[in-house]
Swiss-Prot record:
Methylated by PrmC. Methylation increases the termination efficiency of RF1. This is Peptide chain release factor 1. Belongs to the prokaryotic/mitochondrial release factor family. The keyword Protein biosynthesis applies. Keywords: Cytoplasm, Methylation, Protein biosynthesis. The keyword Protein biosynthesis applies. Peptide chain release factor 1 directs the termination of translation in response to the peptide chain termination codons UAG and UAA. One of its GO terms (molecular function) is translation release factor activity, codon specific.
Length: 359
């Protein structure tokens, strides 16, 4: 099937979906209505671009006709030639855009995410930088109109985070933040440094798509659930009723503890969200590691310990090592304005996938 047949098939399906979504039987079936609505939304940009492309093709035909029928009118012929030139340039732009829109979509792109940030090498300074990254993602999420909820946090004594887990919900969250997984390195003078020396520290970020209960086939027998009393500062028990929950996935030994909420039920629900995401991510990583190197993730190696980005404070510089992008905008980026970085990563990924398809 060539690209035009593919595009026509997408448009035909889009029109069919429009009819189905106005069918009373479909509207009354909430689950089916949501599935079809999601499918329609995922095809919308492609259909709009394809319809605009067909109009550009018609503009080329019209301009060629005008040149033929100009009857020696130099001004009319010149105008038609300019219109033809513009339309042909537009045609090339649309063809590239449509190739990208037809690329196989990551099935997780529309999902919410579980975001984990940990202070790694560098002690207190690494934990403080983990807090800076948390703020950066919070502000970026706010600008995107997403919901950002801190689910669990383990702080150190200086206001940094040894570990923090957050849920980010909204439209196409995973598609934009999936490239953030990896080691983020910071170079700056710590507050505690009296000699003014630049120190290097690292925080790690892990982005996992949310896994709905219906998607995850976790056998309850594979889970050990412990209930205990939530503890506050200094280790004292803060609840008379045991509300804290620890869930261990026995086959992988993945463990989640949750005590942020006041009820055992809510802590259990949150812990299960994280455990489903971590277990799915664990097996996804095994599957990816077994793939041929050529078929691995097109950005980086997929290695969680891979250094993906450096934040250099003295030079106000951010460098993404995977795509060779350097921006002298560290302050802007840490304030949540991540669009330039995200857009560059998305474009690079799409370009790599196009090259693979053309091999």
């Amino acid at each position: 099937m060539n690209i035009y047949d593919q595009l026509q098939a997408v448009e035909d399906r889009y029109e069919e979906l429009g009819e189905l979504l106005s069918d009373p039987d479909v509207v009354s079936d909430t689950k089916r209505f949501m599935e079809l609505s999601k499918e329609e939304a995922s095809n919308r940009d492609t259909v709009i671009a394809y319809r605009e492309y067909k109009q550009v093709l018609q503009n080329i035909v019209d301009a060629e006709e005008m040149i033929k029928e100009s009857g020696g009118d130099a001004d009319l012929e010149e105008m038609a030639k300019q219109e033809l030139k513009d339309a042909k340039a537009e045609k090339e732009e649309y063809e590239e855009k449509l190739k990208i829109l037809l690329l196989p979509k990551d099935p997780n792109d529309d999902k919410n995410i579980i975001l984990e940030i940990r202070g790694a090498a560098g002690g207190d300074e690494a934990a403080l930088f983990a807090g800076d990254l948390l703020t950066m993602y919070q502000k970026y999420a706010e600008a995107q109109g997403w919901r950002f909820e801190v689910m669990e946090a383990s702080m150190n004594g200086v206001g940094g985070f040894k570990e923090v887990v957050a849920m980010v919900s909204g439209q196409s969250v995973y598609s934009k933040l999936k490239y953030e997984s990896g080691a983020h390195r910071v170079q700056r003078v710590p507050v505690t440094e009296s000699q003014g020396r630049v120190h290097t520290s690292t925080a790690t970020v892990l982005v996992m798509p949310e896994v709905e209960e219906v998607e995850x086939d976790i056998d309850p027998k594979d889970l050990r659930v412990d209930i205990y009393h939530a503890s506050g500062a200094g280790g004292q028990n803060v609840n008379k009723v045991a509300t804290a929950v620890r869930i261990v996935h026995l086959p992988t030994n993945i463990k989640v503890e949750m005590q942020e909420e006041r009820t055992q039920q809510k802590n259990r629900e949150k812990a299960m969200k994280i455990i489903r995401a971590r277990v799915a991510d664990h097996f996804a990583q095994i599957a990816q590691d077994e793939q041929d190197a050529e078929r691995k993730s097109t950005i980086g190696t997929g290695d969680r310990s891979e250094r993906i980005r450096t934040y250099n404070f003295p030079q106000n510089r951010v460098t993404d090592h995977r795509i060779g992008l350097t921006l002298q905008k560290l302050d802007t980026i840490l304030s949540g304005k991540l669009d330039e970085v995200v857009d560059a990563l998305v474009l690079y990924d799409q370009t790599q996938k196009l090259e693979e398809l053309n091999k």
